Amino acid sequence: MRAWMNTGTTLALLASVALGACAQSNVARLPSRTGPTDKLDMTTWSVVGVDPVSGDVGVAMASCVANTLADALAALVPGKGAAATQAAFDVGNRDKVYAALKEGRSAEEIIRLVSDSVTDARLGSRQYGVVTMSGGRVQTAGFTGKPMLDGAAAPNASRWAGVRANASRGVSVQGNTLVNEAVVANALAAYVWEDPTGFNSLSDRLIRALEAGSVAGGDVRCNSDSVRQTAATAMIVVARGTDGPYATEKIGLSDQGTPKAPWLAISTTTSRGGDNPLLDLRRKYDLWRRTVKKN
């Protein structure tokens, strides 16, 4: 594993020291897309990235909610863009974003589409991060509900929320209920960092960005009541430029390991107070990467 830090200390070592050894946990099966998904809290921080040269697109996420709908937040349309729909998740809004990506709409257009309080009574509980590409131009746009922003800005606030992006590098990082702003700031820095050893593929950048957010503290709910876990669920999905679009039809990590899954689809879930899932996600990712390289 290669880290983004110039000190030479790897993220794997930092995570191991801070969070303890990792153990595999069974992946939870969750409600289908017909269930009351808009009442479920989804995703504390996520990273959306695109490669305008190859057309590859991907999303990585982590949350303290163990029974999260991790895979459902992602909308991937190779060659056009990717998005994360999170906080108070609504599959209908995810589908709107997905359809707009397939239509080739810009990131700003997509955010306008889903940030209208007239059509969404729960807009204040939503968060989005979108990255689009067209004709070599990359655009980023994000949205965080005002109540989340107001709460993060309050005196002595302990639940930071917001979006940070870098359009020139094709990345957007968004999060809510975070320990502090460093979770997204460090994730963004990790994503754009150039590993001198060459571990700079889209998937490499996504996973090291997610790890950097974990090292910064992650989800405040997993860092309270003597628990120092940062997350309970972690996931990464990537589709290549030549692949078809992807947004899961049956949420609950059910596509993992099936023909429906995108080129890269890895997830892991642990119980609250258990081992940090980012460690197991890295182990699975490194194994996947070695297998892909051999092939």
Give the ranges of each region predicted by the language model.
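N-terminal secretory signal peptides that target proteins for export/translocation
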Residues: 1-5
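N-terminal nucleophile
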Residues: 26-295
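Bacterial N-terminal signal peptides
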Residues: 8-20
